[in-house]
Design a protein with these regions (language model features):
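Positively charged, polar, low-complexity stretches
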Residues: 2-44, 48-86
């Protein structure tokens, strides 16, 4: 599927806010709302990849706990891991 940037951002915002668990809805929603308009194309693609991970592994990754999968090191994942939810 070939999405333009506007469509991709819209898809990412939706997926960030409707994850399945309230905690991840709030955390990823706040993260996405803060950074979505500051990201370049590569970062948007990496954010979409991050959203493909299940909530449990994302929550553990964010909190520095052991994950069941290998999560690659990139700018988005580092930005997410260091994001301070307020």
């Amino acid at each position: 599927m070939n999405l333009n940037i506007y469509q991709l951002k819209k898809k990412i915002i939706y997926r960030s806010n409707y994850r399945g668990t309230k905690e991840m809805d709030k955390l990823l929603g706040a993260f996405t709302n803060k950074y979505i308009n500051k990201l370049n194309n590569e970062d948007l693609i990496n954010l979409e990849k991050l959203l493909n991970l299940d909530d449990n592994n994302l929550y553990n990754f964010y909190n520095g706990l052991k994950t069941d999968i290998k999560i690659e090191n990139n700018n988005i994942n580092l930005l997410f891991k260091n994001f301070k939810y307020e």
